[in-house]
């Protein structure tokens, strides 16, 4: 194959390769959910739970603290409150951004109004927060906006609620934005009925704090991530696939130009 034919072949391949790369970037990624460990037999005041998130290249230690206490802590076996799981596209926890519902049966069930915090041993990116049975309750996040990805209001409901109902039934959620003054804004996730679903926070996090707005036994949650901060923003030095594509195209163009100048002499 001559150099000119090689260059022409590469240029013809660029549109197809670009579409492949774009499709890959637009698709949902698997979520790596927290594996809650241990069995704290005292869910009362001062509760602390521990877990791990294992991604392809890292293990993130997760610590959950709640001064008021919780309803119960399920870290091994027990009822699977994250059903229905099949088909996956109908799950109240999956969406265009989330491929898979929470893994296993692990869940932290909440009971009391008040603040609680998740702390991560290394920075994570765009955490996904899955919730069960947020009926007659709400979660309030101070100065931390979120996106409602999905919830189970029934397959015929409007998006993003067009998913199967959860373990305890159907429901809806909405976001309320409340200006508290002094530069503080509270973003509230409000449930009606028996909502089960998932929300996502955008950005890099070492911790996440929220407030249960009312006491109610019980509503539950877990948390997962697509990437750690290091995975989402790898050290420079290794070109990404799109970068390689541009390098090949540029090199081919340069060679073609030089070849053309040679033959014209």
Question: Where do the PLM segments sit?
Answer:
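Terminal, low-complexity interaction segments
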Residues: 152-235
């Amino acid at each position: 194959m001559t150099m000119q034919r090689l260059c022409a072949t590469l240029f013809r391949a660029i549109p197809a390769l670009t579409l492949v790369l774009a499709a890959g970037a637009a698709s949902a990624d698997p979520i790596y959910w927290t594996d809650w460990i241990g069995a704290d037999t005292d869910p009362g005041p001062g509760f602390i739970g521990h877990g791990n998130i294992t991604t392809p290249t890292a293990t993130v230690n997760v610590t959950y603290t709640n001064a008021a206490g919780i309803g119960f802590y399920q870290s091994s076996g027990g009822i699977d409150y994250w059903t229905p799981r099949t088909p996956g596209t109908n799950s109240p926890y999956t969406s265009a951004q989330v491929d898979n519902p929470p893994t296993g049966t692990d869940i932290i069930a909440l009971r009391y109004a008040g603040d609680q915090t998740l702390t991560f041993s290394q920075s994570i990116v765009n955490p996904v927060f899955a919730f069960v049975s947020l009926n007659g309750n709400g979660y309030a996040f101070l100065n931390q906006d979120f996106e409602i990805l999905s919830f189970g209001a029934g397959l015929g409901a409007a998006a993003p609620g067009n998913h199967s109902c959860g373990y305890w039934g159907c429901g809806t959620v909405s976001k309320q934005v409340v200006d508290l003054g002094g530069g503080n804004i509270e973003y509230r996730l409000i449930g009606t009925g028996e909502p089960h679903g998932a929300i996502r926070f955008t950005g890099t996090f070492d911790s996440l704090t929220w407030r249960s707005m009312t006491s109610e036994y019980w509503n539950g949650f877990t948390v997962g991530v697509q990437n750690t901060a290091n995975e989402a923003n790898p050290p420079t030095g290794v070109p990404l696939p799109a970068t390689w594509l541009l390098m090949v195209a540029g090199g081919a163009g340069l060679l073609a130009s030089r070849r053309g100048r040679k033959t014209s002499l």
